[in-house]
A protein has these predicted regions:
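Catalytic cores of secreted/periplasmic lytic hydrolases that degrade extracellular macromolecules
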Residues: 1-163
Length: 163
């Protein structure tokens, strides 16, 4: 099968540096918003390619691929959308543009603090794996989303940030 995506099995220096950059804010947010820092970090790594995607770099700083506007600012980017029948089509869509990583992290936390995401909150789960399972189909349509996040958490020992 040529369509199998590679899994992260060994840590990269680029990702380790990215974690060091955003982890202080992620820890602060996780305590304030009842979230797992490990899941927040893993999602940022996965969604932004460790801060290397065009959307996550300056001047956009969008770490989570959140569409729409942030304080009136957005950037048009190509994205693949599923038509509901499994057919992927590339479209141009507006994505939120942030002044920095911190704003992106806090905006994401605000998004998942809505009741829709209650199944992701630390107080409603027994482990980060419950939270990653809840995000699958809720935040992302990718059926392998939880396993991808769990693999990142394990590879980089991100659960240490949940203590």
């Amino acid at each position: 099968n040529d369509n199998v995506e590679p899994t992260v099995t060994s840590a990269s220096d680029q990702t380790t540096t990215f974690i060091q950059t955003i982890s202080p804010t992620a820890i602060e947010i996780s305590k304030t918003y009842d979230l797992y820092a490990s899941v927040l970090l893993a999602q940022a790594i996965l969604e932004s390619s460790s801060g290397q995607s065009d959307l996550s770099k300056a001047p956009n700083y969008n770490l989570f691929g959140i569409k729409g506007e942030y304080k009136g600012k957005s950037v048009q980017m190509p994205t693949l959308e599923d038509d509901g029948k499994g057919n992927m089509t590339q479209i141009q869509a507006p994505f939120r543009a942030y002044p920095n990583y911190s704003a992106s992290l806090y905006d994401y936390a605000e998004l998942v603090s809505s009741q829709k995401y209650a199944s992701v909150w630390k107080s409603n789960t027994s482990s980060y794996k419950d939270a990653t399972a809840a995000l699958t189909g809720l935040y992302a349509t990718d059926t392998a989303y939880a396993s991808k996040l769990n693999q990142i958490i394990e590879t980089y020992s991100l659960d240490a940030y949940d203590k």
